[in-house]
Structure formats: structure tokens, C-alpha cells
Amino acid sequence: MKDHFHLAWFLSQGYGPKTWRSQWPGSASDLARWMMPDLFIDLAKGLDRCCFDYMIIEDSSMVPYTYKGSHDTYLKYAASTPKLDPAVLVSYLAPATRTLGLVPTLSTSEYP
């Protein structure tokens, strides 16, 4: 019997828009695009085609404040924030995939 291994993708901190000044947003009217699931649906479809077994989607309900002891830099440059809630995001990804497992992590402090 051959040894099997599993392929997983960890969608982690930084899967938000990252920098508003980068080429990614395109124009000012596209800034809200980070709120749309299209980018992540495309990623999930690609992982499905590549025979990945599952995607883990990290949940974090905080804005860091380690740089200069302030949230300001993280919010100004969209570093590590904002991002979509994994519990909601998986409801968009599931219908778009055939065999990809979706594993959202949920902060227990946010879900009763």
C-alpha cells in the first residue's frame, strides 16, 4: 500500500486587502471589493482542481497594536485587518467546490 499524504491550504492572517495603496484595489470604487467573496471562491475552486484536501480559514477578532503600541498603523495600511468572518465565508465557498474540505476556525469568545 502506498503512503498517502494530505494537502491543505491555511488561509491566515493577511488574507484581507493588505494595502489600499497597492495595485490590487484598482480604483477607489474597487476598495469595497475585499468584502466580496469572489477572490476566495476563485482560490477554493483552484485548490479543488489541484486536489487539495482542505482549506483552513483562520479567525481573528482583533486588530494588532504591537507596532508603536497603537492600532493606527494596522488600520491605516489595512495590515492584518479587515477580513471576512470565516463562518460566513464558508457558506459562499462550499457550493463552489466539489471535494475540498472547508475548516473555519471560530473564536469561542465571539460565538455563544
PLM region spans:
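Acidic, glycine-rich active-site loops and adjacent beta-strand->loop/helix elements
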Residues: 61, 106-112
